[in-house]
């Protein structure tokens, strides 16, 4: 996870991610955003689910469809905060609390993932 370094929801927990560029598919965009925010180079994303969202950006409300993927990482991966992430960290599933995630769709996704994987 990362701690958001910018608004909206600055200072709250988040999952690394962002917007897909015009020449990317969802998987490519997600892998690029994770690399930009954490330095991690990951592969083989497994699609989980999507959640419709309203995202506040530059004074505008943008309708988005947030896509969630599961990625497996090596035990010795070190994430480093970069781009718009203020901090990057690993937390065990049993320490996650969906209410610590400041963006509604992310909070709902974490809640759903935890209910399906505990």
Model-found features: residue ranges?
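N-terminal strand-loop-strand
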Residues: 1-14, 42, 73
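Conserved S-adenosyl-L-methionine
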Residues: 46-50
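Charged phosphate-binding loop/patch that engages nucleotide di/tri-phosphates or the phosphate backbone
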Residues: 102-118
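Active-site donor-binding loop signature of nucleotide-sugar glycosyltransferases
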Residues: 4, 17, 93
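Unchanged
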Residues: 20-43, 53-104
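Gly/Ser/Thr-rich beta-alpha loop segments that engage phosphate groups in nucleotides
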Residues: 13, 19-20
């Amino acid at each position: 996870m990362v701690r958001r370094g910018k608004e909206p929801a600055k200072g709250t927990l988040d999952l690394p991610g962002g917007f897909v560029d015009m020449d990317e598919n969802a998987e490519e965009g997600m892998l690029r955003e994770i690399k930009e925010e954490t330095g991690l180079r990951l592969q083989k994303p497994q699609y989980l689910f999507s959640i419709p969202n309203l995202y506040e950006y530059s004074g505008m409300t943008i309708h988005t469809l947030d896509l969630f993927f599961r990625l497996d990482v090596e035990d010795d991966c070190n994430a480093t905060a970069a781009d718009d992430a203020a901090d990057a960290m690993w937390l065990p599933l049993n320490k996650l609390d969906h209410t610590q995630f400041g963006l509604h769709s992310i909070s709902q996704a974490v809640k759903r993932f935890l209910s399906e994987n505990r």
